Amino acid sequence: MAELMLLSEIADPTRFFTDNLLSPEDWDSTLYSGLDEVAEEQAQLFRCVEQDVPFDSSSLDVGMDVSPPEPPWDPLPIFPDLQVKSEPSSPCSSSSLSSESSHLSTEPPSQVPGVGEVLHVKMESLAPPLCLLGDDPASPFETVQITVGSASDDLSDIQTKLEPASPSSSVHSEASLLSADSPSQPFIGEEVLEVKTESPSPPGCLLWDVPASSLGAVQISMGPSPDSSSGKAPATRKPPLQPKPVVLTTVPVPPRAGPTSAAVLLQPLVQQPAVSPVVLIQGAIRVQPEGPAPAAPRPERKSIVPAPMPGNSCPPEVDAKLLKRQQRMIKNRESACQSRRKKKEYLQGLEARLQAVLADNQQLRRENAALRRRLEALLAENSGLKLGSGNRKVVCIMVFLLFIAFNFGPVSISEPPPAPMSPRMSREEPRPQRHLLGFSEPGPAHGMEPLREAAQSPGEQQPSSAGRPSFRNLTAFPGGAKELLLRDLDQLFLSSDCRHFNRTESLRLADELSGWVQRHQRGRRKIPHRAQERQKSQLRKKSPPVKPVPTQPPGPPERDPVGQLQLYRHPGRSQPEFLDAIDRREDTFYVVSFRRDHLLLPAISHNKTSRPKMSLVMPAMAPNETVSGRGPPGDYEEMMQIECEVMDTRVIHIKTSTVPPSLRKQPSPSPGNTTGGPLPGSAASPAHQASQPLYLNHP
């Protein structure tokens, strides 16, 4: 059974969209399952309805000029004098055809179509009862053959032959028309027509599946008279056709048990009871004479569609399942169309957003490139400005360093040139140099010689008695002055351990100590001269004693038990040995004393986070000099107080032979010496005792 489709749902244009193009996978495989058997017939019928072309053009002769097709239900103007009326009989009985044939044969000659008349062929079939929807039962097709012959005496017989239709469901009709221009020169012609007959649908039917009925081939042959078989030359004009009386012979055709075809008739034709159906002939007719007649065009097959007849069958009831299934299919198609439309709109929206984002990205990239270029320009300008300021800073720093180097460096312009050194000293490694601050009690003149020689020729070597080189103090005296000066005060405070002190304060302290040492040296040089002058004045005042004359001659002089020969000792030999014994350092002030009359005071408290402190209080000026100006020298004592931090304490051993003779002389002890050590000699004056230093330190 063919699938059922409602015309109202198919014809509604609002239920489908232009983009509703389903692929073969979207359709159900069973949609056309019922149409497999009648695919060929259905295609033929639907093609004729849609294209409005009733006949197949493939069967036409391409050598002929074919006129454009016309509607199949319009009368053809080719043969206006020919009207075929056919009444096919039922396949069950042939009585109707026999009666019709007898009726046609008994008609008077006046009713036989002649020249200018129309031949009527009537084909009737039982009309089915009226129905709304359903199937039309199969009705057999037959082949009708009509032979019309013209003669001078009587009418030609018209034979009707029914033959089974071909499987292609097409009715072929061949008509042979034999005519002559005159009774003596008849015109012979032959026409082959293709006739397609359909049973009309009853009025009131909307849509149904009509089974393919058995179509027949109608062949109409019009032959010449027997006396015209000799074949004379055709005349110049076409004679009118005078057919013989029609004799119909029917041949029953059994019904065909083949596949049925479905036909859809949108507008049925109403059958008039008084008017017989008209056979429609469309297309050119080729007429070919027989015998020696001139050549004529080849016959052409044309399709004849008879008027539809009412049917006798009623379609069964509509299947509800198929209807629901068809509705579901339509809904599925609609939903698929909507989903595709939504997907398309979504993709279009995504494309629009993508284009907008790409445009924004390009704009941001351009802005980023512009900002980078501006940043590079600003960085280049900033680097140029920094480079200029850096150059100025470098120049200022270099000028400051040069100023320091020329004023306080080793090549300072204010520093005197160093004393020349002997080649032997230049070859040897430099040893640490030290400044010695000391004093000695007044004694013979030879006690001051070592200091004077050291002051006059500093840095020179003096060979000892054993042949070893002896080293002197390398402290230089500028301008040959006989006072102890520092070589360079700036170099004494440039060491790493003194950088945390105030430089100005350090220089001030160094100047104070240097002045104190110089005043002490000048005082030691003045005291011996005054003592010698006093002794000379006392000797002048005393008269020499009178010696008595001995009674006996003097004998040989007595010798000292010490020895006959006294070796000469260089007065400055012990000075370098003494400096080496105390391990003198050039950046340190030394106070050396061999007397034990100093006062020692211990510290009451001590800070464990700092070094022990020590204060030295010693005479600052000579006995007859004053600095403060507070009064006569006898009222006040000028003392120098030195604040120190104890760095280290140790015990050293000095040979007695290395001690200078001026410091080695020990006076007789006095009862007031509580320390038990040697005290200064009694020959020393009180002023000289007052000039001795006083050591104050904690134990």
Curated annotation (Swiss-Prot):
Extent of Pro residues compositional bias: 68-78, 545-556
Entry GO terms, CC: condensed nuclear chromosome; early endosome; endomembrane system; endoplasmic reticulum membrane; microtubule organizing center; nuclear matrix; nucleus
Topology, Cytoplasmic side: 2-393
UniProt biased composition (Low complexity): 86-109, 680-693
Transmembrane segments: 394-414
Membrane-topology annotation of the record: Single-pass type II membrane protein
Location of region: Disordered: 59-114, 218-246, 290-313, 417-474, 519-563, 657-699
Protein name: Cyclic AMP-dependent transcription factor ATF-6 beta
GO biological process entries: mitotic chromosome condensation; negative regulation of ATF6-mediated unfolded protein response; negative regulation of gene expression; response to unfolded protein
Key word Endoplasmic reticulum present: yes
Record field: compositional bias (Polar residues): 458-467
PTM statement from Swiss-Prot or TrEMBL: N-glycosylated. During unfolded protein response, a fragment of approximately 60 kDa containing the cytoplasmic transcription factor domain is released by proteolysis. The cleavage is probably performed sequentially by site-1 (MBTPS1, S1P) and site-2 (MBTPS2, S2P) proteases.
Residue ranges occupied by any bZIP domain in the UniProt entry: 322-385
InterPro entries found in the cross-reference section: ATF_bZIP_TF (IPR051882), bZIP (IPR004827), bZIP_sf (IPR046347)
In-chain residues carrying the UniProt-annotated modification N-acetylalanine: A2
Origin: domain of life: Eukaryota
Regions of compositional bias (Basic residues) in chain numbering: 519-529
Site feature Important for cleavage by MBTPS2, where: N407, P410
Gene designation per UniProt: Atf6b
Pfam family, one: bZIP_1
Domain notes: The basic domain functions as a nuclear localization signal. The basic leucine-zipper domain is sufficient for association with the NF-Y trimer and binding to ERSE.
Location in or out of the cell: Endoplasmic reticulum membrane
Stretches the record annotates as Basic motif: 324-344
Cleavage, annotated site positions: L437, G438
Region (Leucine-zipper): 347-354
PANTHER family: ATF6, ISOFORM C, CYCLIC AMP-DEPENDENT TRANSCRIPTION FACTOR ATF-6 BETA
